[in-house]
């Protein structure tokens, strides 16, 4: 696959009001898992609406290392899976992104073996993969760890009832992909309910799997003997849509976000409404208007359908210039308040207390050199720069390229004063 060009920094100046129309890409958090799921069936699977981002390129490289042929052009990814897949995910590829752990499920399901490096990617504190391994053990898999690798074997995966101690998205995905070729019925209780889980289940069912209940807390999978490659369109990226909502919320204006799904963002849209934004669905997306300086709100991150932890950096950025005091509570990843130190450099008034932050909005931020610590925090700093006097230079912009296809160009099309440094 061709690499995605990366910029060292993104330069932002105070902007607004924003206006115009922007289209969201397919969801990163779905596309990566669908690419992994293609391993379940030899032959050619075709995915449409695949974003041109670094993480997709890296997943393609990982699949190529396993023997697949991967092409990505014009938003369509073609994955040719051989009969003989190499069941290993090496460190130099896996350490780039945590999502690569989801090759474990399909490799076990189809081949009965896997050797996967302990994953890397964004560091949000303690994010153990124990739930993945415990769940797969319930199906009959056995694991050892050696020299930084998880070595897995499963002579005969057998359906079982698996109760997740937390509705982990990754664990749910790995269990789904492992169990579709297992003997008997698997039931996942306390399963993750995200739209990306439902998208994966739709893809698997098109391949010939028998999955029901995806999008609810109980998913049932009846194992089948074999699957076939298919064609599928990736669901829209709700986190990218939230990024544009935060941008217009901070800068003011009126925009249309094509492709966005209001029904995938209910809780966030309710909170934005409390802040004073107006958001309503259109025939093919969302219309959003921000009348000016927004009011404060209290937000707690929760598993879907609650406010997603991926939205949290954008909410913090918006509250940093709101008219009043807001409180954000992070219940998913305790180490995810990494935007705060950079926003403080921009003049924000934020106080952290454990897994809570208290944000007293200021009238305007001050442009400053800052660093993107991860994908969403980096994008949130770009959005914050729209409300900062002077110039904001967001360094380590390669993180942003991991999750966004042309964020700079799309914000510029709405009237933002932004470019690559």
Predicted regions and their residues:
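Short, structured segments at the rim of ligand-binding sites
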Residues: 1-421
């Amino acid at each position: 696959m061709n690499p995605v060009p990366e910029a060292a920094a993104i330069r932002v100046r105070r902007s607004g009001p924003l206006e115009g129309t922007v289209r969201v890409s397919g969801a990163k958090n779905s596309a990566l898992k669908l690419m992994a799921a293609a391993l379940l069936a030899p032959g050619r699977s075709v995915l449409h609406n695949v974003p041109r981002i670094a993480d997709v390129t890296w997943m393609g490289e990982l699949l190529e290392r396993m023997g697949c042929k991967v092409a990505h052009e014009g938003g369509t990814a073609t994955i040719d899976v051989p009969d003989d897949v190499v069941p290993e995910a090496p460190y130099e590829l896996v350490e780039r992104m945590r999502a690569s752990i989801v090759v474990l499920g399909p490799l076990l399901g189809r081949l009965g073996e896997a050797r996967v490096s302990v994953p890397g990617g964004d560091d949000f504190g303690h994010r153990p993969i124990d739930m993945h391994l415990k769940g797969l053990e319930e199906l009959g898999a056995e694991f050892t760890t050696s020299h930084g690798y998880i070595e897995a074997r499963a002579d005969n995966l057998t359906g079982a009832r698996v109760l997740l101690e937390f509705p982990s998205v990754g664990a749910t995905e790995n269990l789904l992909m492992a169990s579709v070729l297992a003997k008997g019925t698997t039931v996942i209780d306390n399963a993750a309910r995200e739209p990306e889980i439902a998208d994966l289940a739709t893809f698997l069912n098109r391949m010939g799997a028998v999955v029901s209940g995806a999008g609810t807390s109980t998913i049932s999978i009846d194992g089948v003997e074999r699957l076939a490659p298919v064609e599928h369109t990736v669901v829209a990226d709700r986190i990218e849509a939230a990024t544009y909502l935060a941008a217009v919320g901070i800068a003011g204006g009126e925009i249309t976000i094509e492709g966005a799904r209001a029904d995938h963002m209910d809780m966030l849209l309710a909170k934005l409404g409390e802040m004073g934004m107006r958001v309503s669905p259109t025939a093919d997306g969302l219309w959003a208007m921000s009348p000016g300086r927004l009011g404060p709100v209290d937000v707690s991150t929760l598993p879907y359908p609650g406010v997603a932890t991926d939205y949290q950096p954008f909410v913090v950025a918006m509250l940093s210039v709101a008219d009043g005091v807001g409180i954000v509570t992070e219940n998913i990843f305790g180490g995810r308040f990494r935007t705060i130190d950079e926003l403080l450099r921009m003049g924000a008034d934020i106080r952290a207390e454990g897994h809570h932050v208290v944000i007293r909005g200021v009238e305007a931020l001050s442009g400053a050199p800052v660093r993107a610590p991860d994908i969403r925090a980096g994008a949130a700093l770009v959005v914050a720069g729209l409300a900062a006097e002077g110039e904001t230079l967001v360094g380590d912009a390669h993180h942003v390229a991991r999750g966004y296809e042309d964020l700079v160009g799309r914000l510029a099309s709405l009237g933002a004063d932004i470019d690559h440094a």
